[in-house]
Regions:
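Active-site-adjacent loops and short helices of periplasmic peptidoglycan-processing enzymes
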Residues: 2-160, 164-173, 178
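Intrinsically disordered, low-complexity polar segments enriched in Ser/Thr/Pro and acidic
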Residues: 1-2, 290
Length: 291
């Protein structure tokens, strides 16, 4: 079914369903892939920058970290105004590791295009690779047309499919390391020699001392992953957390922006994670009967 609420193995326990504002979300056990809670998880939604998880997957599978990519005119100038960028310069040479850091931490759209063109020769060819990979890992309702999630009506996914991508990406040590960082300094280059470019994470769940928000969205068990926002997609996130012997993935799509801007997604993730950690252990997840 499209919307199925998980319940605890312990029948004597009254499991309260997590309260989420998001119209489409899912909670998955990272190790087994078991779905612990879902709401409209197979409904097609715009993924915004959570798309970049797939871009990172293909980068990690097709490149060496010390490989150098050169930014084209298209990579620099095809990003619409107001979308996040790493101020990459035309002709600038950056390593794959540097590009992955700015792709995943501040969500740089220009970095996504540099990577796509480096790997596949064009955005279109890279999108085909993205779609093939999505099918390979089990996605059922996903179609990509670009590497960054800039809005396009033919660019969509689902909470379930994005959870699969998150689960797949978290198998890479480099991905796990990068998405857990709260900031990154991109060193000066020949094309940008002013100073280091400093970037902060877009993920409120891992910002321990985040004073610019009226509420603290930090979650002590959060381990990272990827946010997204466009006017059409609203607020999105694929988030990961680990407590004791359980690692979880939460996906929240098209979330409200009424509570302190973008961070309603953080509150929804907290609710999902708390539900999972309070009602499941590794043993109950493994033994849970598939419905």
């Amino acid at each position: 079914a499209d919307s199925s609420d998980a319940s605890s193995n312990n029948s004597s326990t009254d499991v309260s369903v997590p309260s989420t504002y998001s119209p489409a979300c899912i909670l998955m056990d990272q190790n087994s892939g078991k779905i612990l809670y879902s709401k409209n998880a197979n409904t097609k939604m715009y993924p915004a920058s959570t798309t970049k998880i797939m871009t990172a997957i293909l980068t990690l599978e097709n490149c060496k970290l010390d490989e150098v990519a050169t930014a084209s005119h298209n990579a620099v100038y095809s990003i619409p105004y107001s979308y996040s960028v790493a101020t990459i310069q035309e002709g600038e040479e950056l390593t794959i590791e540097q590009l992955l850091n700015v792709l995943l931490i501040p969500s740089a759209n220009d970095a996504a295009v540099v990577l796509a063109e480096h790997i596949a020769g064009s955005v279109e060819a890279f999108a085909e690779m993205m779609n093939n990979k999505a099918v390979e890992i089990g996605c059922k309702n996903t179609h990509f047309v670009n590497p960054n999630g800039i809005h396009n009506e033919d660019h969509y996914s689902t909470a379930y499919d994005l959870a699969l991508m998150g689960q797949y990406a978290m198998k890479f040590d480099v991905f796990r390391s990068i998405v857990s960082k709260t900031s990154y300094a991109l060193p000066a280059t020949a094309k940008y020699d002013k100073e280091d470019r400093l970037f902060n994470t877009t993920n409120d769940l891992i910002k321990k001392n985040y004073s610019s928000s009226p509420r603290n969205y930090y979650y002590e068990y959060a381990t990272g992953a990827k946010t997204g926002y466009t006017d059409a997609a609203k607020s999105c996130i694929v988030a990961t957390a680990t407590k004791n012997d359980v690692s979880l993935i939460a996906v929240v799509l098209h979330d409200s922006t009424t509570d302190a801007g973008l961070s309603q997604r953080a509150l929804d993730c907290k609710a999902l994670f708390e539900y999972g950690f309070n009602n499941y252990s590794e043993k109950t997840i493994v033994n849970k009967t598939d419905v």
